[in-house]
A protein has these predicted regions:
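Unchanged
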Residues: 59-82, 92-146, 167-181
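Low-complexity, intrinsically disordered or signal/transmembrane-proximal segments
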Residues: 2, 8-11
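A conserved beta-turn-beta hairpin within the catalytic core of GNAT-like acetyltransferases
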Residues: 46-50
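Conserved N-terminal beta-strand and adjoining loop/helix that marks the start
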Residues: 10, 14-37
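Short, active-site-adjacent segments that bind or coordinate small-molecule cofactors and metal centers
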Residues: 146-166
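Short glycine-enriched, charge-decorated loop/helix-capping segments at active-site entrances
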Residues: 52-58
Length: 181
């Protein structure tokens, strides 16, 4: 079965047609040189099944990305963010699934007690172990950029099925140009 990196689709409910918002948020919460990662193993028909991702989700009607960020972090982790940094805008494209715009945040300021998540298992993963996890190829790129850069960046990631075919930084630098086939 072909999966997709993207979750927004048309939903038909009675007489109304609902379109899932193509704007999402993702946050990497940091503590003691580790990131809080979500191992997506609990949801059926999950496009992120068996992947390790940060915490986040779709912006809902009437929300700003920051409203979504706070809501999703609390819903999925039980933590309350006290502050955060808007680090990047990630544009995902895939033929047949449209475009998704992800607001990427980091935070090292939060309160609360970690709770069980119904989407997967939450785990503090040391930063030097992140690359060994089952991540989307594009996620590896923005992890590297988060480490290397203190400035905001824009990254366009294009997937063909589950394969990353394009990664363009700030609209001009092709990050896959030297990749081995």
């Amino acid at each position: 079965m072909q999966s997709s990196r993207f979750a927004h689709k048309w939903y038909f409910t009675g007489e109304k047609i609902m379109i899932r918002n193509p704007v999402t948020t993702l946050c990497y919460i940091e503590k003691e040189n580790a990131f809080l990662m979500l191992h997506r193993i609990k949801k059926e028909n999950d496009v992120n099944k068996d992947k390790w991702i940060g915490v986040g989700g779709h912006v809902e009607e009437g929300e700003s990305p920051e409203d979504c960020l706070r809501r999703e972090v609390t819903e999925e982790t039980g933590l309350t963010l006290l502050s955060w940094q808007f680090r990047a805008l990630i544009t995902f494209t895939q033929e047949g699934y449209g475009t998704e715009y992800m607001c990427l945040y980091t935070s090292d300021s939060f309160t609360g007690i970690l709770k069980e998540c119904d989407e997967g298992t939450l785990e503090w993963v040391p930063k030097d172990k992140i690359r060994g996890l089952n991540l989307w190829e594009g996620d590896l790129i923005f992890f590297r950029l988060l480490e290397e850069r203190n400035t905001f960046f824009s990254l366009k990631l294009t997937y063909t099925e589950d394969t990353l075919t394009e990664a363009v930084l700030d609209g001009c630098e092709d990050l896959l140009i030297h990749r081995q086939p």
